[in-house]
Amino acid sequence: MVEPIFKPGDYIINRSAGDMAIIDKVTKKNYYHFKNYYGGMFNEFKNVEDKSYDLQVNYQKFFDLCNEEEKKKLDELIKNRGK
């Protein structure tokens, strides 16, 4: 079993796809749930409100922690969401 490397509150990014997210929690079944998940391919936020969009811990290898510039970019996208 793969142990989670990210923790709640971490900003993560898949640099090849452009996906960015803020982790809300890691479940006992090793799924990440998100406060926000921005899909870079379609430039849209995924529906995380009903917890139907999650990520298995096994896929964390495709993600890295965001640097400060990337965090600011995601915060700006969240701020302007729906405008």
Locate the predicted segments by residue.
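Short coil-to-beta transition motif at edge beta-strands of beta-rich domains
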Residues: E3-R15
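Basic/aromatic-rich interaction segments and small domains that mediate binding to polyanionic partners
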Residues: G18, I22-K46
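Intrinsically disordered, low-complexity, charged/polar segments
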Residues: Y38-K83
